Amino acid sequence: MSSPTKLTAWQKLTEHKQEMASVSMKSLFEADPKRAEKYTTQAAGWTLDYAKNRANEKTLSLLTDLAKEAGLESAIKGMFSGAHINNTEDRSVLHIALRASQAQETLMVDGVNVLAEVRATLKQMEAFVTQLHNGEWKGYTGKRITDVISIGIGGSYLGPKVVAEALTPYKKDGIKVHFVANIDGSDITGKLKLVNPETTVFVISSKTFGTLETLSNANAARDWFLSNGGSQSDVSKHFAAVSSNVKKAVDFGMAEENIFPMWDWVGGRYSLWSAIGLPVAIAVGMDNFYELLDGAHQMDEHFRTTPFEENLPVIMGTLGVWYINFHNAQTHALIPYDHYLRAMPAHIQQLDMESNGKSTLLNGDGVETDTGPIIWGGAGTNGQHAYHQLLHQGTRLVPVDFIVPLASHNPIGEHHAQLFANCLSQSQALMVGKTLEQAQQELRDAGASPDQVEAIAPHKVIKGNRPSNTLLTDKMTPATVGALIALYEHRTFVQGTIWGINSFDQWGVELGKVLGTDIYNRLVSDSDNSALDASTQALIKAFKKAQA
């Protein structure tokens, strides 16, 4: 695909942006009493209210045209059929197969029925989880397992950790699940202080069983185990792996039956639905893990079959393109008004930025427009006392997604009503703002003098007309959490398709790994560093001096 800027719909949107320059969202609501009803749609347990956007019917029609002209319909068919849409690695992209309906028996990719492999892995996971929870799996001293430490990084860490945290109300008694990712020794040291080697199982997640951070932490965990009473022959009772490199995992000390597969057609940031999600299944049980998969599948089917005009991922994805490419928005904020979802922005940050942080088109040419935005955010209402000031009065346009359940798992007094009120008030305030006249009258009503009114009122002006979406669900459940994450996966795919980039490789990450290994070797040796830049040389010298 060539640059999307050459598409007819893109050029029409460029003209339309000028038409919309002086249009306020308030005026759009005033002109259409049914706007809220028209700009609300539902799928997989979620309701999307996108009425508070700088968009009218013409905007949305042009955005739909853009998606179609960019080939989104064929791209969706390609992904769901197993086509090699990851062109730089010549791979299928089949995270959707990990949560396919049980009614679907086959999905052939390169001569292999991948659904058979997925179902076999789920049964393997189920047996593992059952043994842990019923006490059949025992440690080397015969005691029941009480703790599981998951060791991974990136998609092998963020997704499972975020989902396990989001499903806190569904956690099973008896086993606590902990997560380790950072190669900073403080991370694993802190977790090991919480557990007993006799009753702890480690799950090591690494496709190659060679990821630097993960393998370093796995070795540290094994060393700790061996120095606290365990023997090498006991390692198989306390270590399992999710990896495609069975030999390396066996050499580490694991039993082959406790090594779970990974596949090339699943990228790390899309892998929580696979055996990478084993820590989630241990935390909440396989019944809830299946519900998680089912919720994601419901969103998959919505995305695959629903007309673009009513399609949640398409609507959210194209609106994002509208702001990034036609309003110069450089970031996008996710603000969940649910304590258990507080870490979700970090997962979506990886999902989106690793997928769409690209500057090369599928055909090898350089892009001619902005691609992936910076994704950030945090829990409401905490953010209101931190960064919301910039959202309301800052100079940069930041589209916002508010995510909130209608009911809480912990109904205490008026807490949830207050939480919900804050969420709605923030979206409303972003839209309506405060005029100079309103600020002046507010000050007069408070008894301010004319001089004070003149001096202070300009500082209280809030321009408004800042866009936001609101996502509602009845309650955060395994199914709705699954659907929510799948929604953002598909939203990311929509945008990548429109921009004409590959959302499923990550060559920038790979470069960092290579250079990291090179620098490490220089830190621990007396190699000649004269070919390096002066800054890197000085930093290496500082490290060596500190270690002397």
UniProtKB/Swiss-Prot annotation:
Q: Name one Pfam family in it.
A: PGI
Please state the protein's primary subcellular location. cytoplasm
| Any GO MF annotation of the entry | carbohydrate derivative binding
The pathway entry for this protein reads as:
Carbohydrate biosynthesis; gluconeogenesis; Carbohydrate degradation; glycolysis; D-glyceraldehyde 3-phosphate and glycerone phosphate from D-glucose: step 2/4
Keywords, A to Z, come to:
Cytoplasm, Gluconeogenesis, Glycolysis, Isomerase
Per the entry, what this protein does is: Catalyzes the reversible isomerization of glucose-6-phosphate to fructose-6-phosphate.
Q: Which family does it belong to?
A: Belongs to the GPI family.
Name of the protein in question: Glucose-6-phosphate isomerase
Upper lineage: Bacteria, Pseudomonadati, Pseudomonadota, Gammaproteobacteria, Oceanospirillales
